Amino acid sequence: MPTNAGTSLSSYKHIVAIGTTVKSESLESAAYEIPRKRKMRSDSAAVSGNSVSTPKKLKSHLPSSVPNPGMSEKEVVEDSNEILRYPVNLAVSDCLGTKSKWSPRDEEQMRAVKEALHVSKAPSTILCREDEQIRIFEFVKGCIDQQKAGSLYICGCPGTGKSLSMEKVVQQVGDWSTQAGLPPVDTLSVNCTSLSKTTDIFSKILGEIKPGKNANTNSSPLQHLQNLFSQKQESSSSRMMLIIADEMDYLITKDRGVLYDLFMLTTLPFSRCILIGVANAIDLADRFLPKLKSLNCKPMVITFRAYSKDQILRILQERLRVLSYVAFQPKALELCARKVAAASGDMRKALCVCRSALEILEIETRGSTGPESQGPTPDDSVVRMDHMAAALSKTFKSPVVETIQSLPQHQQIIICAAAKAFRGSKKDATVGELNKLYLEICKSWMISPAGITEFTNMCTVLNDQGILKVGQARRDKLKRVSLRVDESDITFALQEIRFFRNCLL
């Protein structure tokens, strides 16, 4: 091989250039320790012909996709043949890309999936709430930079990530203040529902600012705080204080005066309080902002919207991605996300539904008897749509679902036919077209179909019940038919019956 010494030096420089931390000594030892192919005579001649009496050239442990820029294609091939490093790299990549086999009978796997879906499992990254976190962080950061008190009101329905986002922001504020060389911010988190008396919140704030100091008998904790923030403090005690009042709507139902007094603490001339109130009541700001505005303590408002179907699905997928096996059918997760988003957008409820579906599969697997239950786990032994539908039925029960479940079989077949017909861009069809699909389903399952007159009458009944919409036409077959209910409701209502589950595939 020509220019061995030059090539080895170039290869080593290339390794250093891309940030490899392997030292030359370790590379030399690696070159001697790695098993080598038997040398051919041509190789021996090439080595003996080299006048440079240096150790064997240093070999780059980079894959062939990152060769030495100074080497030709032929040299790369020869170099790769000299040291057997590729089988090792391929084995590692194969291991990294292989998914483990999922088995609902494996207690360790089942425990890991349940843990990943538990409400108390705080993810490292709060997905779909990045904008809200940035706004909260910038608000707190601005107050600290200006050494100025302020108030913020965070509202949103339960399960929309408010408390979780606040925990993340508190961590970010601590990291930022440390990096900026600023004094740490004192943080007080209070769940208002845990207070024996609503006025106890002032005692907690006072205890955080002045540890061990109780208000004297002549003044209440609130009065003590008002006096404290009305006069200039010593520089040693001028640290900012972040107060997070969770479940703040509890104060509204108990004592609105406490709510007003709490926000007014941020308006005092020497106040160092950064107040963040968190509540489920979205209309709280609308009901009490006028009063707070008149008191010159109107807070900034950030609303956490309910999670959409796509957001719920993304969060569920992210939680399950840490597992080395697939435990849920993708369509089952989509069904959960769609139903929860339509009902409430509560992420905690979506997690509970998924855990419930997993438990249904677990019970089903344990309940199976016979010799076949001792064999290998079937490939479809994941959480399917029927498991998810059963779990959803425990949580949600809409009148539409109950109506569909109570219908006669042939009317349910018509609904399934309509759901299949309108899955794409097509939103309606004629009675005749729908009847053709109905007949195909009946024929495939060897069910005696109803005649066209009876079929038309059943469509009229479904129209009266608000499930189908049947238009007007001179001939019954030409009447336009469309669905009035969501396909997810149909799937949800009928998935527990195997016949309909297969019809909806």
Curated annotation (Swiss-Prot):
Biased composition (Polar residues): 45-54
Molecular function in Gene Ontology: ATP hydrolysis activity
Places the protein is found: Nucleus
Broad class of the protein's primary localization: nucleus
GO cellular component, one term: nucleus
Chain positions covered by the region annotation Disordered: 37-72
Cysteine disulfide links: none
Entries under Gene3D superfamilies matching the protein: 1.10.8.60, P-loop containing nucleotide triphosphate hydrolases, Winged helix-like DNA-binding domain superfamily/Winged helix DNA-binding domain
Signal peptide: none
UniProt GO BP: cell division; DNA replication initiation
Keywords for the protein's UniProt record, in alphabetical order: Cell cycle, Cell division, DNA replication, Nucleus
Lineage: superkingdom: Eukaryota
Role noted for this protein: May be involved in the initiation of DNA replication.
Family designation: Belongs to the CDC6/cdc18 family.
Protein name (Swiss-Prot/TrEMBL): Cell division control protein 6 homolog B
Originating species: Arabidopsis thaliana (Mouse-ear cress)
This protein's encoding gene: CDC6B
